[in-house]
Design a protein with these regions (language model features):
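Bacterial N-terminal signal peptides
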Residues: 9-18
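Accessory terminal and edge-of-domain segments that mediate assembly/interaction
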Residues: 22-347
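Bacterial N-terminal signal peptides that target proteins for export
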Residues: 1-8
Length: 347
């Protein structure tokens, strides 16, 4: 065989190897450690610290600057990481965890703003589905976009408006002293690609929480404190009432959670989310994790402790107490630990 033939054979072999490496079946898994684990992604550093402190046989892995801690927590093999605030951070850290560890289930926890006015500061909300209402089509006014030839059709742009009962969700309008101001913000479904729906992919608005994990969450009975550990200055003393929330926090399961790239402090938009979506809570990470979980076929659940009623000043004193006393991270960790206990002993 001459050099020309050797070159051709080598080129064909290299091309075949490259093609094989690009196929979905050749995707590498658990690049760092391959013990089956529950992945815990915390958006709140203090809570992650509590969980890591209680983890048995902890081992820290630093991947792309992110510290992942493996070990056993309440008898369950886990890997714990802090995502930090934002949809993008949540997406990147969750996918990094999925790539480098053998994650069989995902748990997200952290702080959130309340949307349902019936809830109180300190309540821990466990929604049964999550959505991203700030994925929008921003029209010039509140007229239904007809970009692709008919009302509400934006398919030629690779987009789809979110709808309820077959009708697009009405756009948000801002009330002002001069009257209602249309924003032209129409909610969209977002596009997700998985091994199961490739190559066409699909549009989704809601990402349902895993039914088995939700059943365990409904059964747990964690004791949630009204005063955080820092509310008591000296051992045996009464807690400082200014560092306690007024209403004993409860665990509330069900309803829709929503996430977005904005920090929500607008009471009008909060009301809009509650009226149009019956949203229970708003934050900046979970729906992104849910998208990653769905794309990777990994069941997930999320726990969120309410820091306030988003944009409502009347809850400011309780919000201060929640953070200053350490109550936020204490109650969040209590729910996560109770869930792991329940998960370990599930039938």
């Amino acid at each position: 065989m001459n050099l020309k033939h050797l070159f051709i054979v080598a080129t064909l072999a290299l091309g075949a190897a490259s093609a094989f490496a690009a196929t979905p079946s050749a995707k590498a898994a658990c690049l760092t450690e391959c013990t089956p684990r529950v992945g815990i992604v915390s958006a709140f550093g203090q809570e992650a610290d509590i969980l890591v402190a209680q983890t048995q046989a902890p081992h820290a892995w630093v991947i792309n600057g992110n510290r992942f801690t493996t070990g056993t927590l309440r008898g369950v093999p886990v890997v714990i990481v802090l995502s930090g605030v934002s949809m993008i951070n949540s997406t990147m850290v969750t996918q990094l965890m999925v790539d480098h560890f053998k994650v069989q289930r995902l748990v997200m926890s952290g702080i959130a703003g309340g949307v349902n006015p019936a809830h109180h500061v300190g309540d821990v909300i466990i929604p049964d589905r999550w959505a991203m209402p700030l994925e929008v089509f921003w029209n010039r006014d509140s007229t239904l976009p007809a970009t692709c030839g008919k009302a509400a059709d934006v398919s030629c742009l690779g987009l789809k408006l979110a709808s309820a009962d077959g009708k697009p969700v009405p756009p948000f309008s801002l009330a002002t002293p001069a009257g209602s101001v249309p924003t032209g913000l129409f909610m969209r479904e977002n596009f997700v690609m998985t091994a199961a729906n490739a190559p066409g992919g699909e549009f989704r608005f809601d990402y349902p929480v895993d039914a088995e994990m939700l059943a365990v969450a409904r059964a747990i009975k964690p004791v949630l404190a009204r005063c955080g550990p820092k509310a008591t200055k000296t051992p045996g003393a009464q807690p400082d009432p200014s560092l306690c929330v007024k209403t004993t926090p409860q665990v509330i399961v069900g309803g829709r959670g929503v996430s977005g790239t904005a920090f929500l402090a607008n009471p009008q938009y909060r009301t809009y989310l509650f009226e149009q979506l019956q949203a229970q809570t708003f934050e900046m990470e979970t729906a992104a994790l849910a998208h990653v979980a769905y794309a990777n076929h990994i069941p997930y659940i999320a726990f969120r402790s309410l820091s306030d009623l988003a944009g409502a000043e009347e809850f400011n004193a309780d919000a201060v107490a929640l953070f200053a006393s350490g109550l936020a991270e204490t109650n969040e960790a209590a729910v996560t630990l109770a869930f792991l206990d329940g998960w370990r002993h599930r039938k």
